[in-house]
Structures are given as structure tokens and as C-alpha cells.
Regions:
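Helix-start/capping segments and mature chain N-termini
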Residues: 1-75, 98-280
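Ordered, amphipathic secondary-structure segments that act as subunit-interaction surfaces
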Residues: 79-93, 99
Length: 280
């Protein structure tokens, strides 16, 4: 079951042959984590979605307020009998018609949901998580790279590369050969009490969890926080590297090429993140 424009319906009732999201990737989306019926960081997700729609010149329905978004997500979760935690995808796509040039900028939306086992964030303390660079394709330094659109070929081919090479993830680089993010999350690097993450202007996703971690880190005593470009060479001198996204929270990287990393700061930040959620 899905939520299609505010109506709960079966997936089989949706036609794809004229759907612009399917035909041209003419769609933007948000991945949400819901805990006990509440969207985590709902306001941040809502305003990023609205900004993304404006960037691609997609009309925002007048009725689609943040309260409406929360209500529609809750309606679907209830219909699917999901009571604890779930992963939700909210996708907006331009209405059918036209080729590359649409005949309208009006939009529609679909919401899907699936159960998550863990409501709070965690990672397995002694597990390995190995990454390497994905160099077949680059992410360009432009505004479109910072939004969650359905054009994800770099991430798809990178995921296949990671799978074929026994890696847990890959790090993406931009056209200036700087590391900007992982396949499905932002990246942070710790070196000598300085925490660095690439700026959005480098082409990384304007991540919701990135924003939360930056805010928590800036309140952490003795920790310098900076948004600056990261070269692949700098990664090999780091003390810790971790990935952030709204579903996983924080995922420490344990190995990049021959270098192995700790997770002390990642562990501290994830505890503070869970406190933030409980206080929510």
C-alpha cells in the first residue's frame, strides 16, 4: 500500500508509462525516519524538499504544508500497522506530459514506507566497514548535486562497483578530485581534534543528518569544526572517518585502503544524537 496524492491505494493502481519521474528522472524525494509516529527532523526535511522543488521549477501544491506532510506519513504508517519505527520515502514528480520540456510544472507525490527494526541510532562496535574511492564518474560542483533528485546513476554504478570489489561503501569525488561524500551519506573526517566535512559548494548532498551532526559537534568541548574541501590524501592521515545519513545516523569507517581508523568521536556523537531524539 502507498499514499498517492493523499489517497491510500494499492501499488498496482499506479501507471508508470507516462510518469515523468520514471521516464526522465523528473522527480525529487526525501528519505524520512519515523519513530513512534513522529518524523525525525521534520522541519528540516520539509524545507529541503520545498527548496529542491523550487530549484527544479516544480510547482508546490498550496495544501502541502509541513503539518499535511506529517499527517499523510502517519496515515500510511497506520494503514501498514507500523507502530514503532519506519523508513519513509516521499517523492514528488512533475505531472505527465511533454518530453524533456514538460507541458505543466504541476506536481504529484507518492509516499512509501517500510518497517525499521531499530528506532534509535547505533552501530556494531567491533564490526569492519571498508571503503575506497569510486573514480569512474565524478560529481559536478553545481546546485543540482546538492538536492535529492531521482538522477542517481553515479550512486548506482558506485554501489555496483563496491559490491563487485567486496567494499561496504565508496567515496565519491568531484570534478576537482576532492572527496565530497559517500554513496548514501555525507562524510566527516577527524584529525587532531578537528572535525572536517566538505562544504555543500563542493557538490555534496545538503544532508539532514549532516546538519544535525554539525550542530552537535559545534557544542562539543575541545572540538574544532570546519567545512572545507578534503583531498583523498588527507583521508589517509585522519584519526576517524564516518558517514552520516538519516536512516543509519552515523556509520564509522574502519578501513580505507591500508589505513585503519577508530570510532571514539563517532560513538560520542551518536549517543548525543540519541539524547536529542529522546528529548525531541
Amino acid at each position: 500500500m502507498i499514499n498517492y496524492n493523499g489517497n491510500l491505494t494499492e501499488n498496482t493502481n499506479i501507471s508508470l508509462e507516462q510518469n515523468r519521474g520514471f521516464l526522465y528522472g523528473d522527480a525529487v524525494f526525501e528519505t524520512l525516519k519515523v519513530v513512534d509516529g513522529k518524523i525525525l527532523f521534520a522541519e528540516d526535511h520539509y524545507f529541503r524538499l520545498m527548496a529542491s522543488m523550487r530549484i527544479v521549477r516544480m510547482e508546490i501544491p498550496m495544501y502541502f504544508t509541513m503539518e499535511y506532510m506529517e499527517e499523510q506519513v502517519k496515515n500510511l504508517a497506520n494503514a501498514l500497522n507500523i507502530s514503532a519505527s519506519c523508513r519513509v520515502r516521499l517523492t514528488f514528480f512533475r505531472k505527465s506530459g511533454g518530453f524533456y520540456l514538460p507541458i505543466t510544472n504541476d506536481s504529484e507525490f507518492i509516499i512509501t514506507a517500510e518497517t525499521l527494526q531499530e528506532p534509535l541510532y547505533s552501530f556494531t562496535e567491533n564490526s569492519t566497514y571498508e571503503v575506497d574511492l569510486f573514480k569512474d564518474f565524478y560529481v559536478t560542483k553545481q546546485l543540482l548535486s546538492t538536492i535529492k533528485s531521482t538522477n542517481k546513476m553515479v550512486q548506482i554504478t558506485g554501489s555496483i562497483f563496491a559490491h563487485e570489489n567486496g567494499l561496504d561503501n565508496c567515496l565519491l569525488i568531484n570534478d576537482e578530485k576532492n572527496v565530497i561524500e559517500a554513496l548514501q551519506g555525507n562524510i566527516f573526517m577527524l584529525k587532531d581534534k578537528k572535525l572536517v566535512t566538505p562544504p555543500v559548494t563542493d557538490g555534496c548532498l545538503n544532508g539532514i543528518m549532516r546538519k544535525q551532526v554539525l550542530a552537535i559537534a559545534r557544542k562539543t568541548e575541545g572540538l574544532e569544526v570546519s567545512e572545507e574541501s578534503i583531498s583523498p590524501f588527507e583521508l589517509q592521515k585522519a584519526d576517524e572517518i564516518f558517514i552520516t545519513n538519516v536512516i543509519k545516523g552515523i556509520q564509522p569507517i574502519t578501513k580505507y585502503r591500508k589505513k585503519e581508523y577508530g570510532n571514539t568521536l563517532a560513538n560520542e556523537l551518536i549517543k548525543k544524537l540519541n539524547v536529542l531524539i529522546r528529548l525531541g
